[in-house]
C-alpha cells in the first residue's frame, strides 16, 4: 500500500516527522517498507510561459526564447533552449539563475554568443523521471511565476506499507488515518461524506440471486457526465503517488474513492446495460472480455455482474471491456457492493492475475461504508464532471454480525505482564474507535465492521499492546510454580532422542519442502501416481513426496557444487502416499552420507564412508533391539548394495548406496549412502535391563563353518541367538573366506563365541556341549559343515 505523506497529514493532525511516523507505525505492527521523497532537492524553479521562440543565429538546433516568469518587472527573460518540443504559448518549468538542480547549478552565461538567463527544464533534469522527450509541459491553467516545488507539492514523501493479510482495513487512507491517530494519540479529521439528493428519477432494476455471496449491493444512475474534463491537480497527485495511472475522470474518481476509503467500486456505461443488473454465478459456456484484454471462459463458481442477456463484470475482481466507461460515455451506472471474501478468495490466483479490487475484497472490506462510498464518488463526479444523479437502489441481506467479545482486565495483565487501569483501557479502545460497554473489570467490545481480524479476546489484548507501544512493555521473567516431577525414561520424545543420537554422530539436520518434482518421485520412489497439488507454489514442486530421498540428494548436489565434499545430513519429515482412494501421511527419518568417513585429521588415514559405517549408525538408533538387514531392490539404490531393514521380521526401512544411474543423471561427482526409516518403528523403546557382572571367568571359542555362498550372515546370527545355550553371551563374525581352497559356490564364516555363567565357572564338558549344540543348529538349518 503506497500513499502520500501530505495526504495523510490532511487527515491526521500529526506532530511527527516522516521518519518518526514510519518508526511508530512499524513498531505498532504496520511495517513501513520505505519512505521515499517525491522529488530530489532543487530550488529557484518557477512556472514559466514561453512568449516567443526564434531560431538561434549560430546553431541550427537551438532556439532563443522569451520567457515570462512572472517576476520580471522589466520584461521577459531570454533563455537559449535546445528542446524539440518548445513552442510559443506553452507553460513549462524554468530554473532561474542561481537555481540548484539535482545534477547542476544554473549560472548566467552565453551559449553560442547569445546570453541565456536561466534554463527551461525537462522532468529528467528535475529528477522527476528517468528519461524525458523534451520540456516538462504543464496544464494551461497553471499560474505563471509560482514556485513549482510548492505549487506541485513536491516537498512530499511516499510511504510504502508492507501489510499483512489480516490488516485489510489499512488498504484505504481512512483506515490508515484511524490507525495513525490511535497510535500517536492525534486528532482525526476525516472529510464529511454528504449524501447526494437525486435530481432525476432514473433507476436500474437490481436483482441479487446470490445473497450469501453479495449481502449488500448499491447502485445509482448518473446522466450527462462530461468525460473530457480533467481531474483536479490534488487528486491526480494523490493517485500517482499511490501508484495508480490516470484513465478517464470517472474511473479516476472511483479509484480515488477506493484509495480513500478502501471500498472498491465499479462504473458501467449505462447504455451498454440491457434492462437490469443481476448478481449471479456464471452459467455454462459464458465468456467475458475483461478490461485487461483477456477473454475469459467463465466457471460456475465465478460470481458475475450481468444484465438480462450477458455477463458485464467479474464481481469484485475486474470489469468487462464492453460495458466499461470510455471517453465517449455520457451516462454511467455506479456500483458499490460488499462481496463475501469467501467467494472472491483464490480467484485471482486461479486466473493468473490480480486487481486492486480483488486484493481488497478477498481480505474483507468495511461493509458499513458501502453506501457512503457511493455517495462520496457521486459527489466528486458531479463536482468535477457534472451530470445529474438518480436515487440510490440498495439491496441488503444478512451482513456479517459483529458479536461483542469479552475482554477481562486480569487477562490483559496476565498476557502482557502489565497492569492496565480501566480508564487506560477505555482510552485505548476509544482511540481505536471500538464500541464497548464496561461491567466491573470486564469490557464487552464490538469490533468495527472493517476489522475482520478481531475475533477473540487475545486479538483485543494485542490491540491494547500495539496502541500502548510494544517497546513500553517492560521485559519481565515469567513466574511459575516449579515442581520437579520424575520423568520415565521411556517418556523422552523419540524424535528428540533421534536428533540427539544423529547430531552426536556428526549428522546435520536439514528441512526440505514436502512439495517435490514429479521426476523425483519416479526416480527415487518408483511412484507413478503421486499425490498432485492443485495450486503448486512452483511448477517443479507439483506433487507431495512419498520419500525423503529426493530432498537429501538435492542437498548433496547443492553442497558438492560448493566444494563441500564431506556431507552427513538427516531429515525428519512427513511423507505422503495413496492407497486406493485414501491418502496417508507418515513420519519418516532419512539420512545421507557422502565423502570421507571422518573429518580430516593428520593422525587418521582417510577413507570414504561405506555401507557398513551407516549400517552401524542404524543399529545405534534401534539399540538395544536387534536390527536385521536382507538383500532387496529399491528404485533409488544400487541393486547390489541395498537392503531392507527389519525389526521383528517386519520391514521398517531401507539402506543402500545411491544408484549409479541417478548419480550420473543428477551430475553428482561422488556417490552416497542413504537410509530411510519409519519413525513409528523407532518410537517403541526398550529400556536396557540391568544384569550383575559375572564374577566368573569368560571362555572364548572360535568355530569356522562352510555354507552356501547365498546364505546370509544375518540369518545365521539370528538363528544362533534364538536357539543358543544360555551360557553363550556373545556371538560375532570375525572372518569371511571364499577362494580356491573351497568348493565353488561355498564360503567360510568364522564366528567368535563368548561363554560365561553368572553363577559358576563353566567346565570343559559344558563348554563343549554348548558349542556342539550351536554347530548342530547350523548343520540342521543351513547345511553347514565345520571347516577343517
Swiss-Prot record:
Co-factor note (free text): Binds 2 magnesium ions per tetramer.
Protein name, as recorded: Phenylalanine--tRNA ligase beta subunit
Chief site of localization: cytoplasm
Binding locations of Mg(2+): 453, 459, 462-463
Keywords: Aminoacyl-tRNA synthetase, ATP-binding, Cytoplasm, Ligase, Magnesium, Metal-binding, Nucleotide-binding, Protein biosynthesis, RNA-binding, tRNA-binding
Transit peptide among keywords: no
Residue ranges annotated for the B5 domain, each copy included: 400-475
Cofactor(s) in the UniProt record: Mg(2+)
The enzyme's E.C. designation: 6.1.1.20
InterPro entries xref list: aa-tRNA-synth_II/BPL/LPL, B3/B4_tRNA-bd, DNA-bd_dom_put_sf, Fdx_antiC-bd, Fdx_antiC-bd_sf, NA-bd_OB-fold, Phe-tRNA-ligase_IIc_bsu, Phe-tRNA-ligase_IIc_bsu_bact
Location in or out of the cell: Cytoplasm
Organism from which the protein derives: Nitrosomonas europaea (strain ATCC 19718 / CIP 103999 / KCTC 2705 / NBRC 14298)
PROSITE patterns the UniProt entry points to: B5 (PS51483), FDX_ACB (PS51447), TRBD (PS50886)
GO cellular component: phenylalanine-tRNA ligase complex
Biological process, per Gene Ontology: phenylalanyl-tRNA aminoacylation
Keyword Cytoplasm: yes
Pfam families listed in its UniProt record: B3_4 (PF03483), B5 (PF03484), FDX-ACB (PF03147), tRNA_bind (PF01588), tRNA_synthFbeta (PF17759)
Reaction(s) the record says it catalyses: tRNA(Phe) + L-phenylalanine + ATP = L-phenylalanyl-tRNA(Phe) + AMP + diphosphate + H(+)
GO molecular function, one term: magnesium ion binding
Gene responsible for this protein: pheT
Entry's family note: Belongs to the phenylalanyl-tRNA synthetase beta subunit family. Type 1 subfamily.
Domain FDX-ACB: 694-787
Residues in tRNA-binding domain copies: 39-149
Residue intervals passing through the bilayer: none
